[in-house]
Amino acid sequence: MTNTTDGDLLLKNITAQAPFPICFADLEKAVAEKIPAGPFGYIRSGAGGEQTLRNNRSAFEKYSIVPRFLNDVSNVHTSINLFGKTYPTPLLFAPVGMNGMVHEEGELAAVRAAQQLNMPYIQSTVSTYALEDVAEAAPSATKWFQLYWSTNEEIAFSMAARAESAGFEAIVLTVDTVMLGWREEDVRNQFSPLKLGYAKGNYINDPVFMASLPNDSFESYVQGVLQNVFHPTLNWEHVRELKRRTNLPILLKGILHPEDAKLAIVNGVDGIIVSNHGGRQLDGVIGSLDALPSIVSAVKGQIPIILDSGVYRGMDALKALALGADAVAIGRPFIYGLALEGQQGVERVMTNIYDELKVSIALAGTTSIEGLRTITLVKNDGMEVK
């Protein structure tokens, strides 16, 4: 519960001694000026002509709120429950790979921020630091492991088992990376963090992966990762087999079609992340927020729905929650914070997003996530959504 009458959620940013970018555009500008073009372009860009990247933003911008007033909104409640645990906010850290290319402490700094904020942290398969190192860095944080299926399936099962042994509490299987998206910005910059070794953490510490290499050279490792990180054969039988191999809840990340959401339930999946990979895989894809309502309708509350892709501020999170998401995952913004100020930068970015969310909930005329389900949203064409 947060008291919203003290008015300090915005003012604390005005009176702070060290100015920090307050919005996504300011963050992006500051990071562009700080880190090399290769890493910046990798993080900023989308696939192809970046239509999906634009679709994500336009999806949020097409929805407007019709607020209600003369309600007591002095105490805003933002807690949620996921898989039997209660969290003070509906915000999560989305899986973002290769954090070491923007900050030397990479995922270690990010997970410490998540621990401090009590927000679930989803670690990427292609992380700079191994999952065991991340677990040790933030022992009390809620940690989930994002899994890229491997061409050698035993590598995928090995990583899932390691995550379970290290205390991770869920497996997030990404389904939209059957091959690498058409990343034109990386070609322009001649930059591939995979080839530079920024994804080494989980692979070089995996016994099954290392045993599959012809030798222990850097070149052998890079080729091994490139051969295994994409999975064109991934199908529902693999999902069922993963379910048999782990005791952890399994979420599918990358679901955009309601029929796939229904199949996820049929196949025993425990949660869904509505996502288009931040616009980085297939160009021309529906914005994640535009995909959300039909998936909410298909799922009917049977399993949790989390949304990511294009969530840059608290108002974006509010709209996703109002349209039925149970939680919202943040990606690019926290990575920009990491690039600027390490752990402290991550905390500041996520806190600003959360503070804007709290203020916006109150200004919309309600006091809780549940209350957001009752507010009126309209599209820019004037059509009432709910």
Swiss-Prot record:
Top EC class of this enzyme: oxidoreductase
Keywords annotated in UniProt: Flavoprotein, FMN, Oxidoreductase
Active site, renumbered: H277 (proton acceptor)
Cofactor(s) named in the record: FMN
Identification of the protein by name: L-lactate oxidase
Pfam families found in the cross-reference section: FMN_dh
Catalyzed chemical reaction(s): a (2S)-2-hydroxycarboxylate + O2 = a 2-oxocarboxylate + H2O2; (S)-lactate + O2 = pyruvate + H2O2; 2-hydroxyoctanoate + O2 = 2-oxooctanoate + H2O2; mandelate + O2 = phenylglyoxylate + H2O2
Gene3D superfamilies the UniProt entry points to: Aldolase class I
Domain FMN hydroxy acid dehydrogenase stretches: 16-382
Function: Oxidase that catalyzes the oxidation of a broad range of 2-hydroxyacids in vitro, such as (S)-lactate, 2-hydroxyoctanoate, mandelate, 2-hydroxyoctadecanoate and (S)-2-hydroxyglutarate, to the corresponding 2-oxoacids, with a reduction of O2 to H2O2. May be involved in the utilization of L-lactate as an energy source for growth.
Molecular function in Gene Ontology: (S)-2-hydroxy-acid oxidase activity; FMN binding
Family to which this protein belongs: Belongs to the FMN-dependent alpha-hydroxy acid dehydrogenase family.
Binding-site list for FMN: P95, V96, G97, S124, Q146, T174, K253, S275, D308, S309, G310, V311, Y312, R332
EC nos: 1.1.3.-, 1.1.3.15
Matching InterPro entries: Aldolase_TIM, Alpha-hydoxy_acid_DH_FMN, FMN-dep_DH, FMN_HAD, FMN_hydac_DH_AS
Subunit note: Homotetramer.
Positions annotated to bind pyruvate: Y42, Y148, R183, H277, R280
Cofactor binding note: Binds 1 FMN per subunit.
Domain of life, source organism: Bacteria
